[in-house]
């Protein structure tokens, strides 16, 4: 049981690190641009503000992948628990698992454009991510539709039991993909709504 707990902590910490990078890079990025007074300049970009922030988020996640990989090796070496790390399995699962975190980042990035100083809420969400990662999907299957829940379960299974991506049930893969696309899409839509709302209220450049 203790061994399982250690392995769970390793996997959970890895996913949490990735999620915070994906979520925080977007929400905090928008808040910083507003503080520095450069937010409106980004909106005048020919590429559009949303795509610019999305690219920044991808870069943040890639950096998190690098540091997460190093941290994973260190944690496994320190604990003596070597997990299965198949890149063809772990990378796609992590990418799809953190997509809802990007969606949440878009939501709070949009809210920070409209309501400005909400950084305290950003910190609370980081703790909420821990709860989502620890969701007991096995006991309560309906909870797998929550952000990060299904990805966390599948990542634990892949790394603790050595299950390959193509060996997962089709239903599990479907839930992972649907939740990733749905939360990311809803978050991006909410971001654009808040952006237009801020422009209508004339508070885009205020902080």
Residue locations for each model-derived region?
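Short amphipathic alpha-helical coupling elements at transmembrane boundaries
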Residues: 28, 36, 40-44, 109, ...
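Alpha-helical transmembrane segments and their short interhelical loops
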Residues: 49, 54-116, 173-178, 182-188
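Transmembrane alpha-helical segments that form the membrane-embedded catalytic/substrate-channel core
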Residues: 18-26, 98-107, 132-136, 187
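Residue-level signature of transmembrane alpha-helical entry/exit and packing/kink sites
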Residues: 5-9, 13, 86-93, 119, ...
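Small-residue-enriched core segments of transmembrane alpha-helices in multipass membrane transport
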Residues: 10-18, 90-103, 126-131
């Amino acid at each position: 049981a203790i061994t399982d707990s250690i392995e769970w902590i390793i996997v959970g910490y890895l996913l949490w690190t990735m999620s915070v990078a994906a979520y925080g890079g977007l929400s905090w990025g928008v808040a910083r641009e507003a503080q520095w007074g450069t937010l409106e300049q980004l909106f005048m970009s020919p590429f559009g503000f949303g795509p610019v922030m999305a690219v920044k988020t991808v870069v943040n996640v890639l950096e998190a992948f690098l540091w997460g990989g190093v941290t994973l090796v260190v944690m496994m070496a320190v604990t003596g628990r070597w997990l299965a790390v198949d890149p063809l399995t772990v990378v796609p699962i992590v990418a799809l698992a953190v997509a809802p975190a990007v969606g949440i980042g878009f939501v709070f990035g949009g809210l920070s454009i409209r309501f400005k100083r909400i950084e305290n809420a950003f910190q609370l969400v980081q703790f909420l991510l821990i709860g989502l990662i620890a969701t007991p999907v096995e006991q309560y299957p309906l909870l797998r539709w929550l952000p990060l829940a299904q990805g966390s379960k599948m990542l634990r299974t892949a790394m603790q039991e050595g299950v390959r991506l193509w060996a997962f049930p089709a239903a599990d893969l479907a839930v992972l993909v649907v939740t990733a696309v749905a939360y990311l899409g809803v978050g991006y839509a909410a971001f654009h709504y808040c952006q237009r709302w801020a422009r209508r209220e004339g508070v885009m450049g205020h902080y």
